[in-house]
From Swiss-Prot:
Keywords: Cell membrane, Disulfide bond, G-protein coupled receptor, Glycoprotein, Lipoprotein, Membrane, Palmitate, Receptor, Transducer, Transmembrane, Transmembrane helix. It comes from Rattus norvegicus (Rat). This is Neuromedin-K receptor. GO terms for biological process: positive regulation of blood pressure; positive regulation of flagellated sperm motility; positive regulation of heart rate; positive regulation of uterine smooth muscle contraction; regulation of dopamine metabolic process; regulation of feeding behavior; response to cocaine; response to estradiol. GO terms for molecular function: tachykinin receptor activity. The chain crosses the membrane at residues 72-94, 105-126, 147-168, 189-209, 233-257, 287-308, 322-346. Its main location: membrane. It is found in: Cell membrane. Residues 95-104, 169-188, 258-286, 347-452 are cytoplasmic. The gene is Tacr3.
Length: 452
């Protein structure tokens, strides 16, 4: 993934340190923003590089990445806003779900994992990364250098695959609702597996992290044993696994779900429960699609930055490359703060939860309806008995020819029509089969709370 602007290889007079930039953790961990080689050409940031003898360069590696104070203040404000909104917003989301029994659904458990990942990246990575990117100086020691290169990839992997798990769960709940849903234990196993895979993917970043103390400068970087080619290959794999592949899965699943939910309703269906549950499912799917699209848009410029600067290395000497990096990194990190805002705007229960969290504000009023939203559980009385039991309780309806006169004396009885067990008390008056069309609407394993 993208890296901070870099210069050429440089040495401290003993060991050559290559600027093998281009990783997720360099935006997440800014691992290798190394010193520019002094010379007559402009620096990677477009700042004039002083002409020094090689011995002077080795002895005086000072920070050449200097910005005006007003620009530093603006960037600090922008990054500080991301951290504040992301940390507090996601912590409130976690509280809303875990503190209210009604909110503890399969989908929401994955949202807890997503919120934890986003809050962790914002709290432990964003500002540290910003400081390193701004000053090109590592102030935080060797242990945090390893953590900074390891944890961000882990957290982003957990975030994107939590969204993928939600997409697959929505797909199964809507397309094949008669199958049992994930239990709480199974959900925990899935979440645990996501984190284990994330740790394995990010482990090389921790293994090869190094600190280099130079005269006037300390650097945190990842030194791959086989050099830049191995580094580039690894991070292309990271881009595929934490961006392209999960987005492909979610694109396919949400497309199928969208066609199912918005492709048309059952002709003549007059059941209120059907419409209520269909509307609730549409809201949840729409909310998650917005979350996924937001993530994709926020991270796209960052990945493009990495690929372009890795292939066209002369871009690292462009005058405004530092500003491009800081902007793309800010946009990527801002993805951690949008989800709580999306939940609050599109989901009435999360909105009620945020009102409760901010009830101390004089302009926030929590109504009795908001309290009930988080405390009351509403189950649909659909399929109170099993499908097999209903199928044995077929109600026989006898139809008469209207031309027969008195139906009590007519012997021209039509074929008995069994009651459709999937109709759920709704009247279906269309040619479309109610048993196939409405099967994705009601399931004995879900309630309205799962979708509202």
């Amino acid at each position: 993934m993208a890296s901070v602007p870099r210069g050429e290889n440089w040495t401290d007079g003993t060991v050559e340190v290559g600027t093998h930039t281009g990783n997720l953790s360099s935006a997440l961990g800014v691992t290798e923003w190394l010193a520019l080689q002094a010379g007559n050409f402009s620096s990677a940031l477009g700042l004039p590089a002083t002409t020094q003898a090689p011995s002077q360069v080795r002895a005086n590696l000072t920070n050449q990445f200097v910005q005006p104070s007003w620009r530093i203040a603006l960037w600090s404000l922008a990054y500080g806003l991301v951290v504040a909104v992301a940390v507090f917003g996601n912590l409130i989301v976690i509280w809303i779900i875990l503190a209210h029994k009604r909110m503890r659904t399969v989908t929401n458990y994955f949202l807890v994992n997503l919120a934890f990942s986003d809050a962790s990246v914002a709290a432990f990575n964003t500002l540290i990364n910003f400081i390193y990117g701004l000053h090109s100086e590592w102030y935080f020691g060797a242990n945090y250098c390893r953590f900074q290169n390891f944890f961000p990839i882990t957290a982003v992997f957990a975030s994107i695959y939590s969204m993928t798990a939600i997409a697959v769960d929505r797909y199964m709940a809507i397309i094949d609702p008669l199958k049992p849903r994930l239990s709480a234990t199974a959900t925990k196993i899935v979440i645990g597996s996501i984190w284990i895979l994330a740790f394995l993917l990010a482990f090389p970043q921790c293994l090869y992290s190094k600190i280099k103390v130079m005269p006037g400068r300390t650097l945190c970087y990842v030194q791959w044993p086989e050099g830049p080619k191995q580094h580039f290959t690894y991070h292309i794999i990271v881009i595929i696994l934490v961006y392209c592949f999960p987005l492909l899965i979610m694109g396919v699943t949400y497309t199928i779900v969208g066609i199912t939910l918005w492709g048309g309703e059952i002709p003549g269906d007059t059941c209120d429960k059907y419409h209520e549950q269909l509307k609730a499912k549409r809201k949840v799917v729409k909310m998650m699609i917005i979350v996924v699209v937001t993530f994709a848009i926020c991270w796209l410029p960052y990945h493009v930055y990495f690929i372009l600067t890795a292939i066209y290395q002369q871009l690292n000497r462009w005058k405004y490359i530092q500003q491009v990096y800081l902007a793309s990194f800010w946009l990527a990190m801002s993805s951690t703060m949008y989800n709580p805002i999306i939940y609050c705007c599109l989901n009435k229960r999360f909105r009620a939860g945020f009102k409760r969290a901010f009830r101390w504000c004089p302009f926030i009023q929590v109504s009795s309806y908001d309290e009930l939203e988080l405390k009351t559980t509403r189950f649909h009385p659909t399929r109170q008995s099993s499908l097999y039991t209903v199928s044995r309780m077929e109600s026989v309806t006898v139809l008469f020819d209207p031309n027969d006169g008195d139906p009590t004396k007519s012997s021209r009885k039509k074929r008995a029509v069994p009651r459709d067990p999937s109709a759920n008390g709704c009247s279906h008056r269309g040619s479309k089969s109610a048993s196939t069309t409405s099967s994705f609407i009601s399931s004995p394993y879900t309630s309205v709370d799962e979708y509202s």
